[in-house]
Amino acid sequence: MTVHRRVLGLFLSLACVACSVSQDQEVAIGKQNAEQVNASLPIMQDSLVADYVQQLGESMARTTSRADLDWRFFVVDSREVNAFALPGGFVYVNRGLIDRAEMLDELAGAIGHEIGHVVRRHSVQQMQQGAKANVAVSLTCTLTRLCNSNVARTAIQVGGAALFARYSRRDEAEADSEAVIITMRAGIDPSGIPVLFDRLLEERKSSPLRIEAFFASHPMEEDRIRATAAEIKALDPSQLAGLRKDDASFHALKERLRQLPQPPEPPASQQLAPGALRGPG
């Protein structure tokens, strides 16, 4: 193959990855990754815990523009504070995050935030941008001959993909706004969103080890928390009237978790990075 043909092929590849990923493709990617996650992480099988989080998450997801997805919610039996979402409606919440939530509206806000990432298709956008970066790297190698070995190409491609493993601040702001809307539509007060995030930010300052995984994929600053609090404060009081902040079933969940054996403290390397997504094949 001549250099010109290779360049043409790479340009066509770049155009291809810019195309939209269909919902069926997104679900297929999410399902494959969910199978890998469920085989790698300790998913809680306790029926009270699993059913509660599934029902809470589903009641919220059904209020969104992507209610037609087969939403699945899982609890990871880990003390680390983390939550992440895969394309297609697969949402994971660590036990450590539930432990930090003191009221229903706080847990609902965290779950609503992850639902927001799926609604906005942030992971899909990351994968598309990562694919574009890898094609651009290959194009550079072809034109400049800087990459003269498979090892060099692989190293650069992996580095390019890693740039997109962390949600952008814009993604996080969009997910926060979605969480406000989603919790309200589900009949839950959104005020718990900034409350929980502020608590996590304070804990990060004093004991970061169990909480750093969350911040590794969810950039958070005080400005972001203040912005969400201001968004909620700007709502008409009538919009918040009658919304739930807490209920007995949430505290039954917390009590059940206290009764169950505590998970071991895993090394950080055992936690699957939320951005480490791979498509079918």
Model-derived features with residue positions:
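N-terminal secretory signal peptides that target proteins for export/translocation
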Residues: 1-4
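A Zn2+-metalloprotease active-site environment signal
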Residues: 6-9, 14-281
